[in-house]
């Protein structure tokens, strides 16, 4: 069954109706300041469209992992301010999630007004494994929309989670996909169902175990699978290299051997790495080939020869999916691998390739390194969700919209 969209809701008539919007506003904070507002920016178009159509918008979202109790550092107060700036209107923040203050403020909304509920994860029922508890909380969220409410799911970064504000609440109200969720699904379908060949996937990040599902799902279908980041050292160990003090998942070595046996013709690994004597931004470091990693030193980035080889592969690709940095990009000395590969993807895109950055740390790296975001075809807001989609897993927050 086709999923109804926020545009369908607006066409049906939304003026004067309360609309609950689940957004993904889980942004990184430092001393109470937002360091990367990407997810807030991505949620604005859907909110604007509803407000301009005269809806009374109630926004639910989470921030961090407060474990079911109020914690000041996880309050959505900085997010309310950032939203107000972008929407050019006041965004009041309820002091609770579904309590007295939330109800009072929701009831007091006029057409075109917006309310942000406090962090949904301040209520332990949001993430409960007990369906009865989640259903009860979802009913309380739905009650904020009165008699003629609707639910818009626009937090793509959370659709892979079976949580009250994402999944259970959709069963309580007429439900629609927001513009962001709709756009994300369209892009991922394009990449997974009929990618233009040659198709290259670039995977980084620290653990093989985190990416195993996506490697298994994609390796048989791609032309090139480039592996960097901390996870490459378990693959290199599987090939017999001494990796020194680099990150190593010993229990995954046999799995990597098996993957290399089956997909060795498409898997590309680094040929040189940047090693450091300790994990520190100012650590003594040098570039070495794979046979020369000093004992006890740790690989924190891929080397320039690897970047060159990977860039060559990417320059011939027509579809590129990238998830996970090539090194510890937060430390300038170990950011060049990520920068080089990202730039190669931007260059491939300029030459006509369709490129997707799969959210999470990759999207953060693009912004941290000051790369041109417009240089990619699409930057996803959902790391985990985009990986699970490409693995072929059901996304609860999407499947519930189909019912």
UniProtKB/Swiss-Prot annotation:
**Keyword set, alphabetical order:** ATP-binding, Cytoplasm, Glycolysis, Kinase, Nucleotide-binding, Transferase
Q: Does the keyword Acetylation apply?
A: no
What GO biological process terms does the UniProt entry carry, in alphabetical order?
A: gluconeogenesis; glycolytic process
List of residues binding substrate: 24-26, 39, 62-65, 121, 161
Protein's pathway: Carbohydrate degradation; glycolysis; pyruvate from D-glyceraldehyde 3-phosphate: step 2/5
Q: Which InterPro entries would you find in this protein's record?
A: Phosphoglycerate_kinase (IPR001576), Phosphoglycerate_kinase_CS (IPR015911), Phosphoglycerate_kinase_N (IPR015824), Phosphoglycerate_kinase_sf (IPR036043)
Which Pfam family, an example, fits this chain? PGK
Q: Which residues bind ATP?
A: 211, 299, 330, 359-362
Where does the UniProt entry say this protein principally localizes? cytoplasm
**Swiss-Prot/TrEMBL catalytic activity:** (2R)-3-phosphoglycerate + ATP = (2R)-3-phospho-glyceroyl phosphate + ADP
What domain of life does the UniProt record list for this protein's source? Bacteria
Name the EC number(s): 2.7.2.3
Taken from the UniProt entry, a GO cellular component term is: cytosol
**Subcellular location, in the record's words?**
Cytoplasm
Enzyme class, one word?
transferase
What are the recorded GO MF terms, alphabetically? ADP binding; ATP binding; phosphoglycerate kinase activity
- Describe the protein's quaternary organization and the partners it interacts with: Monomer.
| Family membership | Belongs to the phosphoglycerate kinase family.
The protein's name? Phosphoglycerate kinase
């Amino acid at each position: 069954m086709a999923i109804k969209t926020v545009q369908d809701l607006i066409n049906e008539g939304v003026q004067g109706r309360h609309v609950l919007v689940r957004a993904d506003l889980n942004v990184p904070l430092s001393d109470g300041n937002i360091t990367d507002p990407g997810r807030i920016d991505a949620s604005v178009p859907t909110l604007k469209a509803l407000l301009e159509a005269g809806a009374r918008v109630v926004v639910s979202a989470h921030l961090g992992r407060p474990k079911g109790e109020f914690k000041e550092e996880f309050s959505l107060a900085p997010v309310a301010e950032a939203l107000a700036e972008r929407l050019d209107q006041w965004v009041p923040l309820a002091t609770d999630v579904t309590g007295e203050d939330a109800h009072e403020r929701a009831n007091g909304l006029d057409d075109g007004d917006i309310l942000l509920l406090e962090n949904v994860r301040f209520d332990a029922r949001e993430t409960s494994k007990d369906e009865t508890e989640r259903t009860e909380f979802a009913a309380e969220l739905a009650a904020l929309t009165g008699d003629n409410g609707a639910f818009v799911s626009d937090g793509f970064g959370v659709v892979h989670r079976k949580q009250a504000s994402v999944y259970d609440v959709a069963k309580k109200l007429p439900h629609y996909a927001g513009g962001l969720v709709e756009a994300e699904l369209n892009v991922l379908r394009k990449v997974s169902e009929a990618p233009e060949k040659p198709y290259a996937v670039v995977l980084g990040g620290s653990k093989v175990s985190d990416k195993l599902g996506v490697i298994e799902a994609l390796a048989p279908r791609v032309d090139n699978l480039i592996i960097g980041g901390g996870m490459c050292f378990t693959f290199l160990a599987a090939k017999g290299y001494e990796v020194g003090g680099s990150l190593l998942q010993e229990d995954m070595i046999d799995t990597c051997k098996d993957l290399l046996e089956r997909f060795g013709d498409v898997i590309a690994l680094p040929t040189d790495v940047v090693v450091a004597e300790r994990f520190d931004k100012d650590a003594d470091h040098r570039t070495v080939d794979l046979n020369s990693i000093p004992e006890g030193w740790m690989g924190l980035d891929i080397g320039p020869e690897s970047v060159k080889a990977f860039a060559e592969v990417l320059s011939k690709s027509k579809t590129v999916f990238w998830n996970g940095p090539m090194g510890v990009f937060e430390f300038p000395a170990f950011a060049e691998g990520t920068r080089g590969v990202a730039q190669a993807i931007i260059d491939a895109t300029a030459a006509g390739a369709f490129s997707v950055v799969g959210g999470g740390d990759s999207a953060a790296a693009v912004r941290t390194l000051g790369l041109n975001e417009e240089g990619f075809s699409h930057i996803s807001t959902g790391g985990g969700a985009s990986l699970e989609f490409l693995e072929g897993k059901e996304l609860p927050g999407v499947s519930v919209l189909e019912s």
